[in-house]
Design a protein with these regions (language model features):
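Glycine- and other small-residue-rich loops at beta-strand/loop junctions that grip anionic moieties
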Residues: 44-47, 71, 122
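Flexible, glycine-rich active-site loops centered on histidine and acidic residues
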Residues: 2-15, 75-129
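Active-site-proximal glycine-rich helix-loop-beta segment
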Residues: 30, 63, 93-95
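Conserved catalytic cysteine-centered active-site region
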Residues: 62-70
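Conserved beta-strand positions in the central sheet of alpha/beta enzyme cores
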Residues: 35-36, 66, 100
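N-terminal beta1-alpha1-beta2 module of alpha/beta enzyme domains
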Residues: 1-61, 116
Length: 129
């Protein structure tokens, strides 16, 4: 059995350097994986880092541990751009990236940004991606 840590990409963890240091510490402690959330909205103004920027820092700060996002809401991303980002991170990490995709959380992460909030539509977008 393998064990991984997962952390948010906001609040105290809204800094790529902090996440990269924690991933290095997790690797040294023997953990198998280090995953971060892919959220973009909060009720409060708090520090937040793009998960792909953070994963680049994590990839360069670790050697063995598997890395990735817990779930990236594919309907919120352009598939070609996400493909380019994941290939880049996978190369930086020497093949240690795992990509989890889904439709994302509730409407609070979508309607504030003018994105599609309907779950059926997001599901169709996930299938298309």
């Amino acid at each position: 059995m393998k064990h991984a840590i997962y952390l948010p990409n906001y609040g105290s963890f809204g800094d790529a350097r902090v996440l990269a240091d924690l991933a290095r510490d997790a690797e040294h402690a023997g953990w198998d994986g280090f995953f971060i959330w892919d959220h973009i909205a909060s009720e409060y103004p708090i520090p937040m880092v793009d998960p792909w920027v953070a994963l680049a820092a994590i990839a360069l700060n670790t050697e063995r541990i598997t890395i990735g996002t817990t779930v990236t809401p594919l309907p919120r991303r352009r598939p070609w751009k996400l493909a380019r980002e994941t290939v880049s991170i996978d190369r930086l990490s020497n093949g240690r990236l795992i990509l989890g995709v889904g439709i994302g959380l509730g409407a609070h992460e979508w309607d504030h940004l003018g994105e599609e909030a309907d779950q059926r539509t997001r599901g169709a977008m996930l299938d298309e991606g």
